[in-house]
Amino acid sequence: MKALVKSKSQPGLWLEEIPEPAIGINDVLIRVLRTGICGTDVHIYKWDEWARETIHVPMAIGHEFVGRIEAVGSNVADFFPGDIVSGEGHVVCGRCRNCFAGRRHLCAKTMGVGVNRPGAFAEYIALPMTNIWRHHEGIDLDVAAIFDPFGNAVHTALSFPVLGEDVLITGAGPIGIMAAAVARHAAARYTVITDLNPYRLELAAKLGVTRAVNVREQKLGDVQKELGMTEGFDVGLEMSGNPAGFRDMLANMSHGAKIAMLGIPAGEMAIDWRTVIFNMLTIKGIYGREMYETWYKMSVMLQSGLDISPVITHRYHYTDFEKGFEVMSSGNSGKVILSWD
């Protein structure tokens, strides 16, 4: 089968012919139809320090996908050939304390699809049946392909109650934009998103945020005054990993506010902990998706009218993957989809 493979310890990916994956008695074989390019994939493509330390070559990469089931193992009773499915990108051990307690997203022995085991940038992928999510009938395949990052957005945005609250989102990348849309759909009063990239701020505006703020041009304090806010934001969603963005968030939260933090800083990050203590802020780290509560929430939100399709801005055939990675690296894109059919 054709696959995009990290076959050399240098920048780039290579389209190669590799064996079709075999399945065990508890596995599902999926014919991949669409994939999304993730920031993780860009790191692997560029072969940065994290990728060099993490990826063992050769490795077929990619973890955002939708496909059609082709075959199932003999123990698989709940999935059938023809089902349209995606897969949870974290394969857990099933035996640790967190897994036994139903907190599988906290498994310390997680294996990442397309990172620690063969990925979805291929014509076929095999996964354990416990990692398979069947989509509702009629779902747009491009949207289904980005359930992984959409799940990051939902997990972050719904970590704290947002009904009637004022929500600040720092970082207007695709996940930040989707998180803002989720908070709005969940009845937040105001959703304000910040960034420095005009393209992405414009994209955020298309998905209905209350304000898309270029912090080079406008201060959050002034935005609060325009909206009639007097005590700061109630909920913060830190999606950027940018120290300045996080410090700006801390300075604009109400006393007792809650912050969900998905953005990963490049290194150690200094903040004024006195603000956290005296303002009694709660900061919660977010990683991945809750298995599978987040997936239920994603499906229900789409079925109840949430439209995230505008966040998908570019589409290519997998043979044109270089164009997809180029536009992703430019910063002037939302989600980028590769077609495999």
From Swiss-Prot:
Q: Which residues bind NAD(+)?
A: 175, 195, 200, 262-264, 286-287
This entry's Enzyme Commission designation comes to: 1.1.1.103
Q: In which pathway does it act?
A: Amino-acid degradation; L-threonine degradation via oxydo-reductase pathway; glycine from L-threonine: step 1/2
- List the catalytic residues: 40 (charge relay system), 43 (charge relay system)
Q: Where is this site: Important for catalytic activity for the proton relay mechanism but does not participate directly in the coordination of zinc atom?
A: 148
Tell me which family the UniProt entry assigns to this protein. Belongs to the zinc-containing alcohol dehydrogenase family.
Highest rank taxon of the organism: Bacteria
Q: Binding of Zn(2+) 2: at which residues?
A: 93, 96, 99, 107
Q: What is this protein called?
A: L-threonine 3-dehydrogenase
**Mind telling me which HAMAP family this protein's record contains?**
Thr_dehydrog
Which GO MF terms are attached to this record?
L-threonine 3-dehydrogenase activity; zinc ion binding
Offer one Pfam family short name for this entry.
Answer: ADH_N
Q: Where in the cell is it found?
A: Cytoplasm
Q: How is the cofactor bound?
A: Binds 2 Zn(2+) ions per subunit.
- The source organism is Solibacter usitatus (strain Ellin6076)
Give a yes or no for keyword Repeat in this entry: no
| PANTHER family noted in UniProt | L-THREONINE 3-DEHYDROGENASE (PTHR43401:SF2)
Q: Which GO terms describe its cellular component?
A: cytoplasm
Show the catalytic activity: L-threonine + NAD(+) = (2S)-2-amino-3-oxobutanoate + NADH + H(+)
